[in-house]
Amino acid sequence: MKHILYTIAALFVFAASIQAQEEDSWEKWGPTTGLKDGGFIARVGYVLGGTTPIPLPAEIRKVNGFSPRGGISLGIDGYKMFSKRWGVSAGAHFFWEGFHTNADVKNYYVWLEQEGEVTKGYFTGTNVTSTEMWGVTLPLLATFRMSPRWNVSAGPYLSLYFHQTFSGEVFDNDEGVGYLREDTPTGTKILMTRENPTPYPDNFPEKMQPVALGIEIAFDWKAMKHMNVFGLLDWGMTDIWDRNFEAITFKMYPIYATVGLAYRY
């Protein structure tokens, strides 16, 4: 009987020590001044992604190339933990992001500029576009601590754009096919060549929305007491174009990911 009691007592002591170690771990990797306190996180990251229609329209037959442009984010977040696992955060992330893409298209409705005049019609060939956006994203997130070192956060965000560019040009594809059917799919045929690419009108940025709404999902891993490695995804839910803009016939959404380092204090 004594052996059984000793065994039970030893198990209780072992369980208590494990619990104490777990609590020490939560304290070690928790907010700087306690599990239910808060603080600030300064972030620096590399941004990659693009602005895209979802789903891709049938007119886009093949994506030949895609590359990010810009690619930097600097931000600050404030957070408050209400319990060991749950909290809330809000912040401001300043960014420079953009992309360059090259795609083969067929019967793609587009506005082009020729000799100072805008020509509208349906293009078949290669379409190249580039965009850059400078601004700030303001997220408001719920935070869940999955473990002492892993946090996941999610919630809405608002982006405000300080500066936007959008440019493009069209020309013949690798098979030598490049032409615009003016006004209708069977209209007058105008040839386009890569030796003399035809650009988009330069007023497209004026038709871009100055704000965007979306959902942000973020992961933080505590590498050290004050240092995090993080990744986040900003998925835009609103079209980048003014609703009355007719040159682009489909909605386009900004979808960008950021990876980087953060300092907690």
Predicted regions and their residues:
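Outer-membrane beta-barrel strand-turn architecture
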Residues: 80-84, 144-148, 223-225, 265
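Transmembrane beta-barrel strands of outer-membrane/channel proteins
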Residues: 42-48, 90-96, 154-160, 215, ...
